[in-house]
Amino acid sequence: MVALSPSYRDGALSALAAREVDVLVIGGGVVGAGCALDAVTRGLTVGLVEARDLASGTSSRSSKLIHGGLRYLEMLDFALVREALRERDLILQRLAPHLARPVRFLYPLQHRGWERLYAGAGVTLYDTLARRGSLPRHRHLSRRGAMRACPSLRRDALIGALQYYDAQIDDARHTMFLARTAAAYGAHVATRLEVTGFLREGSRMTGVRVDDLEHDRTFEIRARQIVNATGVWTDDTQSLVGERGQFHVRASKGIHLVVPRDRIQSSTGLILRTASSVLFVIPWGRHWIIGTTDTDWRLDKAHPAASAKDIDYLLTEVNKVLATPLERADVEGVYAGLRPLLSGESESTSKLSREHSVVSPVPGLVVVAGGKYTTYRVMAKDAIDACVHNLARNVPRSVTDRIPLLGADGFPALWNRRGLLAAESGLHVARVEHLLGRYGSLVHDLLALIREDPDLGRPIEGAEDYLRAEFVHAAAAEGARHLVDVLTRRTRISIETFDRGVVAAPHAAELMGRVLGWTPSQREREVENYRLRVEAERASQEQQDDETADAARLGAPEVVPIRVS
């Protein structure tokens, strides 16, 4: 089994520097990782380069829903909803059943008569567009039935409700598994490689120049086709080409709050109507995720900041339906992400296109942008189709609708055997369920680590939901190069603990350092860098507007590379 280990990265760099690849993908988000998997499973030679970490941008900061998007039905975008629902069902049933799971939602109704008919017709159409039998169909609930499912609702906030199902996924882990699966099929995947320029022969793009941010060196990568899959950085990447793009990407900021599960008594998620969009209250393990906002963002793209105004808006909206209002002190975590929207005529980002676009502005280069997280596979397929057309040779069609990700194979059987796995490993069955939901059939790799060192079977200090083995595994197999990679993406400690992961940080650094060969001073540097990041984020969340929040967030240093000579 291919692991995204330090030695794997060294080999990937050597391979990329030594020979031309058929397709080079720029961007390690969900679309870029999807492009790499699509291309390599067609029999092409593939490289993927990412300037920071896998899923370090938008792909770790979504609402973590795999869904069709009920609000797009109101926009009469039936094709987008149908496509997204088809992809949702593929992910749930075939591609990543270990990472995705159904989630139930209530939509409270506030008006008698017309609203139940109107909303009911919409959810009926939503169910109809989905594949029959993939998830339970919607139900109408009385006020009593809705209050039974969600006792925390204010009685005067609803006259009844609709219940329907969608799905959720840990977006960052899903993206990492996409990249790791691509590597298992032969793609060369390397993070901390920043593209600084394009190579050109005449009018044709023939490769890129990259800076290795870990080793402080520069080299060139040659490719027959290059895919720009850099999301909100699409225009920035295109500027390196020196050619005007055929479309532009605007960033829309969406923030989310995380609160403990006991703050809202409910067995179901909520979807609430707001003046401009919808608001989700999403079950997330022992927590709730509340979001999102939809506002234009023209500041730092690497570290979008949530302001106090953003946070207060979400609390105000959700408190309209809660019997016991949430307060700022209830908020464990806050995260902000940027949606890459194709520019349109409207000034409102909520009305910009969620469709995706694929173009080839110059020979040798394909650009893919826009879209939704759920439809990443279709975006990747379309981008690689364009590459194949430009390669002008016979290449098989996409097969990613039939390629389960690593960890998916045998997952249902392992889930049924979770009690036996618990007995064999000495772990509580709840721990085994946690591991299965994060690693699937790769759980055996974690259990092997614990057999070799039983101390790794203990929870990490400061974040008891996670075992110490997970931090060793993240550095050894999941491509984590820095402490922030593990605390914010391989795990979600940064948003699931009130201290934002500061207590767990030194313990995580010690475990990662065993794999990555960190000296005591290097460990201290990683921990201090993470502490400053948390301080800067907290400071930004006290500011009243985007500009001051952005300035406060930029007070933290970037990742301190572990330089290797």
PLM regions: where:
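Dinucleotide-binding Rossmann-like beta1-alpha1 core, especially the glycine-rich loop
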Residues: K64-A149
